[in-house]
Amino acid sequence: AKCDEGAEKTVVIYWMYDTMPVTQPDVWIAPPFEGRLVEMAPFKKVLVGRGATNSKGPQMAQWNALMSIRAAVGKLPVNLIFVAEGDEERMSIGYRQFVRQHPDLFKGATAMYRFGSQGFSGGGELSGASEGCVYVEITTSGTKWGRGPTVSDIHGGNKRSVDSPAWRHIKMLQTLVSDDGNKILIDGFYDNIEPLSKDEQSKLEAAAKGVDMDIAAKNLGVARFISDDPLTYLKMARYGTSMNLDGIWGGNMYAGGAGAILPNKITSKHNFRYLPKQDGMDITRKLRAHLDKHGYQDVEM
């Protein structure tokens, strides 16, 4: 959608309306797909629903603000192009095609993505950083390894005499990151990362002065951050990289009770966050090379 105000400058506003599936509906205080106003301290009434914060709520607030300015002033100081996609959670495949097919639409334009960043204090935050994301599933199986259970899970008592793909998977994961999980040990991962410009550094330092670490932790629901220094925290949050362990599954997945299983295979899911000069496919190639180098040629990606 376009909003042509006859201005010299044009801003492309990116929106996304898809969400991830609801995996824990029992922890929601209201039906996730209903959209319900509920009382929640310290905000009084809040809207609870899937995508309320990421990102349909902030997008609607942005739209209301822009239309209010337009109604009060007569027109906006810039032209607007709204580009909304429902494919973000699948790596924006359709969006990439759209950009390639309509290069003139984006020529000379500034892009902006408005995320919900209001915290307990009521203040907002303007972020000038960007990131890429790659999801990877890694599987270790006795079938590919040629050791341990090669057809299906077997009784856990057999571990006394049979190798375990599960333990092999855990040992493999230990080669990928430092002991605290905060440094990626894949050769070449940090290649092509450019240092911050003077302008970026000065803006970061200015923003750090307004960061209350206690409020930031409360907003996110964590006890503390990797660093207690506001500037370091902000630099990590905006310009950092990571390899996260999203989840791991295989074998006996039921909590409590008895049940001895020696799994045939274990799978873990990960997401890499990387910076503009890095490349997602290059990162996956380097991950494959790392696994091969450390003797895990049988591990599948």
Regions found by a protein language model. Give the residues of each.
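Short, well-ordered beta-strand elements within core beta-sheets of diverse protein domains
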Residues: A1-K2, G157-R160, T267-L275
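Acidic-enriched catalytic cores of C-N bond-cleaving enzymes acting on peptides and small amides
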Residues: L105, G128-Y135, W145-M253, K277-D298
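Short glycine/proline-enriched loop/turn "hinge" motifs that connect secondary-structure elements
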Residues: V27, G74, S127-C133, A237, ...
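Acidic/histidine-rich catalytic neighborhood of metal-dependent amide-processing enzymes
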Residues: F43-E131
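Acidic/His- and Gly-rich active-site-bordering loop/insert found
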Residues: A1-A52, I69-V78, H270
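Short, solvent-exposed beta-strand/turn "edge" segments of beta-rich domains on protein surfaces
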Residues: V162, A255-N264
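Oligomerization/assembly interface segments of phage tail-like spikes and tubes
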Residues: V136-S141, N264-F272
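Short, glycine-/Ser/Thr-/acidic-enriched flexible segments
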Residues: D18, D87, Q118-F120, T143-W145, ...
